[in-house]
Amino acid sequence: MSHAAYARTAQFSSPREVEAQTLLMAARKLVEVQTNWNGPDKKMQAALLFNRRLWTIFMGAAESNDNPQPLEVRQNILNIAIFVMQRTIEMQTNPTPEKLQPLIDINANIAAGLSGRP
């Protein structure tokens, strides 16, 4: 999502909905790579980079002293983010389409929770 598109979305949606939509966008990019697997290519690298940047933002927010979430919630976010980073490194060093599935599932499940959807 371009910065302009993100800004437009942010104007009309709650922060939770923006986060959910961005997680779904990351999941779609990863699904596209997995479905059209050609080995490690530019699309894989771009999808992993987008996902890693997103989770880096979540990590920063969870670590912030200004974050109003309970400590346990923040710690859970950090634990998930650490897993995402580790899996991303695994994908970059020994890529297989199967290793993308946990990243896809995490993003989709958290997006559903943020949106209030099962």
Feature map (PLM): residue ranges:
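N-terminal intrinsically disordered, cationic/polar leader segments
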Residues: 1-57, 63-64, 68, 74-118
